[in-house]
Each structure stands twice: as C-alpha cells, then as structure tokens.
Curated annotation (Swiss-Prot):
Belongs to the XPG/RAD2 endonuclease family. FEN1 subfamily. GO terms for biological process: base-excision repair; DNA replication, removal of RNA primer. This is Flap endonuclease 1. SUPFAM superfamilies: 5' to 3' exonuclease, C-terminal subdomain, PIN domain-like. It comes from Enterocytozoon bieneusi (strain H348).
Length: 358
C-alpha cells in the first residue's frame, strides 16, 4: 500500500520537494530497485496489453522484464541493485489479510464478468487479480545471478533496506512506487523509474531534505504525518484525509498530542509503526556481512558493479532458452549489449568518494 496520498500531499504543500527528470540524468548512478514492485509491474503490464507471455504452463513476463529492462538501464549508464523483500514485520500481517480479502472480492467479480462475457470488465479485473508468486521471485533472482547483475534479499522490508543503502551512500537513489521509503529515511526516491523507458514518462524525483525543509517538519513529524495518512503497519482513521492529517501535525506536532482530540480506533498502532520506520532503515537492522551467496551476489557494498565480462553465456542460454523458451538469438544479442557496457562499472559520481565504511 505504501503511504496513502503522500505524493499528492507533497505536490500540494511542498512542490519544491519533487521534480521531473529524464532517465539519462541518472547516468553514473547506482540505484536500489524495489524488486517486488518491479516484478509486479512486469506481470501487470503484459495483462494490460492483452498478451500472454509464457512458456508451456509457466509465465515468463517477469523474467523478460528483468532481463531487457536491466540491459536498458545499464546501456543508459545506470547500475541497478535489485532489493528483494525478506521477512515482513508482524505488524504487516493485517495488511496481508486485507490484501487477501481484496483479491477474493476481485476474483469473484472476475468470475461474474467472465459469465457475463464482458470483455472490458474481464480485462480490468484480470489485471487487478495479478499475484506475484514465490517462483516469480526465485526465477528473477536466478536470472540476475546468471547475468552478474547486483541483487540482495533484505533482512525485512525491501523499501527499508533500499533506504539504508541510500543513507549509507552505497547507492545514490531508491527506485520504487511505494512512498514509505521516504519514511525509512531514503534521501532520494524515484518514481516511474521502471516505466520511464517503455511509457516515455519522466522520472519523479522526491528529495527528502527539500520535503522536510518545505513542509517545515522534523523527520519525526513527517513520519507521524505518514502514519496518519495510512501505512502498512497500522489501521487508518476514519475522516482523516490528506488535508486534515497535514493540519493536525502542523498544529499539534505529534500524534501523541492528538489523544483526546481524535478518536483513534483500537488497531491504530502508531507507536509500533513509528518503531518500524525508525529501526528497519538503520545500521542495527541492516549491517550484516554478505556471506550467504543465496541472499546476494554482492561481495562488498563498496564494490557494486555489473560484472558482464565473466557472464557464463552457456548457463544463461540453458536457463532462459532451453528451460524457459526464450529466443536464443535475442538472448545472445542482449548479452552482447551487456558486455559492451563495461565502462558503466567504472564511472564514479563525486559523492561516492564519501561512501560509508562498514
């Protein structure tokens, strides 16, 4: 879910905190990618176009998306670092339950539309019914591993780990559609990053420092604002929307000061949500050595690179072509494009000289 209406709030009350850029602006950047969000977009995009990208009984749109989109980013001088979700906080269970209920409702509507032979509604609910499976994630990780493109499985929430990587200056920005990466302290958040090439959209860049400065909020007040707006770790408050949430924090400074003023539901666990936002994006939660080759293919955060020179082409062909049915010629062409981009691993932005040491 992310943070409800946060993007609109920032554009309304602090327009200087967001700006549009072309993708080429980020040449030379190392960017942490919210992998789950990325895969989900690939799965939905194929449904939206009315295609059926599959091999046998297996969907392959997620693999195709990861393969070709990564190549395009790297061709543009960008090093993607894919971050996958780990174990979610217990407080997120209620959000998963709501998603399950929504999916059941959507599936029922889909079946009704099929019975009525309403192709417009069938297409609509089919897209809404997309579910990312464990196999989708594992196949994308294998693809990245074979291509030597950096990836890591986070200890917990991917958005929190992305924020930590950015705060620690191991990457330069975070690419996700979920605005809660700002709550975890990500200095720079990029939206539309995954679709900027395919849909020719500008990348929306959110600068946390400018947002806090423009709103005249502390980080603590900003997090409380986001909890009031609605997040994954607490219930929402009936009657509190974007404008009222902003006015409450502007006037009362803290959710604690709203006790007795606002009628909080029993499951409004704002203190627990605060704790998650202020702990999951810290060194304490994320400072671990990259010892398990299953969890990551990155040896050290100070040397993040796309090692295209040592790609095992036979292994890539065996998985993508023999096992998943991709066209061998196209895959070989893609690999050649990757191997032409060796310089992207050597380009360094000036602030990388100040990267944090573990």
């Amino acid at each position: 879910m992310g943070i409800k209406r946060l993007s609109k709030l920032i554009k309304t009350y602090c327009s200087e905190g967001v700006q549009n850029r072309e993708l080429k602006y980020y040449s030379g950047y190392k960017i942490a990618i919210d992998a789950s969000m990325c895969i989900y977009q690939f799965l939905v995009a194929v449904r939206a176009e009315g295609q059926s990208l599959s091999w046998g009984d297996s969907t392959t749109s997620h693999i195709s998306g990861i393969f070709y989109r990564s190549i395009r980013w790297i061709e543009n001088g960008i090093i993607p670092v894919f971050v996958f979700d780990g174990i979610p906080p217990e407080e997120k269970i209620h959000e998963f339950e709501k998603r399950t209920k929504r999916r059941q409702d959507i599936n029922a509507k889909l079946q009704d539309a099929i019975e009525q032979q309403d192709q417009v509604l069938v297409s609509k609910y089919d897209r809404m019914n997309v579910k990312m499976e464990k196999s989708h994630i594992e196949e994308c990780q294998k693809t990245l591993r074979l291509l030597n493109i950096p990836y890591v499985i986070a200890p917990s929430e991917a958005e929190a780990y992305c924020a930590w990587l950015c705060k620690s200056k191991f990457v330069d920005a975070v690419a996700t559609e979920d605005m809660d990466s700002l709550c975890f302290g990500s200095p720079l958040l990029l939206r539309n990053f995954n679709t900027a090439l395919s849909q020719k959209l500008p990348v929306e860049e959110y600068n946390l420092h400018k947002i806090l400065e423009g709103l005249q909020f502390t980080m603590e007040q900003f997090v409380d604002l986001c909890i009031l707006l609605g997040c994954d770790y607490s219930a929402t408050i009936r009657g509190v929307g974007m404008k009222r949430a902003f006015e409450y924090i502007k006037k009362y400074k803290s959710i604690d000061n709203l006790i007795g003023i606002v009628d909080f539901p029993d499951d409004f666990k704002y203190k627990e949500a605060r704790t998650i936002f202020f702990t999951l994006g810290t060194d304490t939660s994320n400072n671990f050595t990259n010892e398990n080759p299953i969890n990551t293919n990155i040896a050290t955060w100070d040397l993040i690179a796309v090692d295209s020179a040592s790609i095992n082409i036979e292994a890539v062909i065996d998985f993508l072509c023999n096992e998943k049915g991709f066209d061998k010629g196209r895959i070989e062409t893609g690999i050649k494009k990757l191997q032409k981009q060796k310089k992207v691993n050597k380009q360094t932005r000036i602030d990388s000289f100040f990267k944090k040491k573990l």
